C-alpha cells in the first residue's frame, strides 16, 4: 500500500520509534531508575515491563490505567492474571519468559477488550475456561506452553484469525479444528510425528481458502510489518 499507515498495537511487529514517546511506559524493576522512577501508567497507551514481581499479586505494583492498550511483560513472576482488571481497555497482552505462569485465573475480566494474546515460554500454562471467554481474540499465540489435550477449544473464538502454538504439544494430534474454523487464515507450529497434518499442508490449504491477503503493510526502508485488515 502506498498510503502511510499509522503505527499502532495492531501491527505484528511494532516499530516503537513511530509511536509517540510519551505514550510508552518502559520499566525494568531490576534497574528501576533506568527509564521511569514511578509506576504510574495512567497516561500510557503502551507498557513494556521487565522483572515485575510481587509477593501476592504482581499487578499491585502498577497503577490503574484505562488508556493502556498494549502490555508486554518480560520475566514477570506472575502465576495468574489476578489484578489485571486495572487495565480495563487492554487490547494486546504479551508475556515472554513468565515461567511461573500456571493459570488463566483473572483473564476473563478482559473478555470485552482483548484482541491479541501472546504467551511465550510458560511451560506450566494450559488454557481453561477463563481464556476461552475471550470472544474478541483475533491473534492467539501459545508458544512453548504446557501440553494441550486437543484443539476443540478454538471454536470458542469466533473472530480468531491467527493461531500459533510453536513448541506446544497437542496431545491428540488432530489439527483439523484449525481448518474447520471459519476465520483462521494463518497458523504456526512445528511438525510432530503424531500430528495428522504437516505445517506445509495446513499453510497451503489456508492459502487456498483465503485467496485475498487481507493484510495492511507498513514499510521502513527494506523492512515491512503488517496488521490484519479486519475492521
Language model feature labels by segment:
Residues 1-4:
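N-terminal amphipathic/basic-hydrophobic helices that include classical n-h-c signal peptides
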Residues 6-37, 43-58, 67-79, 89-102, ...:
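Concave beta-strand-loop units of leucine-rich repeat
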Amino acid at each position: 500500500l502506498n498510503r502511510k499507515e499509522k503505527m499502532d498495537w495492531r501491527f505484528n511487529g511494532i516499530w516503537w520509534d513511530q509511536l509517540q514517546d510519551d505514550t510508552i511506559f518502559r520499566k525494568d524493576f531490576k534497574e528501576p531508575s533506568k527509564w521511569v522512577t514511578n509506576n504510574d501508567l495512567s497516561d500510557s497507551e503502551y507498557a513494556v515491563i521487565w522483572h515485575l514481581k510481587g509477593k501476592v499479586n504482581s499487578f499491585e505494583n502498577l497503577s490503574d490505567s484505562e488508556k493502556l492498550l498494549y502490555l508486554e511483560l518480560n520475566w514477570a513472576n506472575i502465576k495468574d492474571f489476578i489484578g489485571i482488571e486495572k487495565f480495563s481497555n487492554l487490547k494486546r497482552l504479551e508475556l515472554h519468559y513468565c515461567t511461573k505462569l500456571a493459570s488463566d485465573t483473572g483473564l476473563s475480566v478482559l473478555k470485552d477488550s482483548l484482541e491479541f494474546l501472546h504467551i511465550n515460554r510458560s511451560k506450566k500454562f494450559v488454557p481453561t475456561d477463563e481464556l476461552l471467554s475471550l470472544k474478541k481474540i483475533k491473534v492467539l499465540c501459545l508458544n512453548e506452553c504446557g501440553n494441550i489435550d486437543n484443539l476443540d477449544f478454538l471454536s470458542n473464538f469466533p473472530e480468531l484469525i491467527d493461531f500459533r502454538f510453536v513448541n506446544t504439544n497437542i496431545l491428540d494430534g488432530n489439527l483439523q479444528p484449525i481448518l474447520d474454523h471459519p476465520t483462521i487464515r494463518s497458523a504456526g507450529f512445528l511438525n510432530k510425528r503424531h500430528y495428522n497434518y504437516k505445517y506445509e499442508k495446513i499453510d497451503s490449504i489456508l492459502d487456498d481458502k483465503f485467496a485475498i491477503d487481507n493484510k495492511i503493510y507498513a514499510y521502513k526502508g527494506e523492512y515491512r510489518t503488517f496488521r490484519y485488515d479486519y475492521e
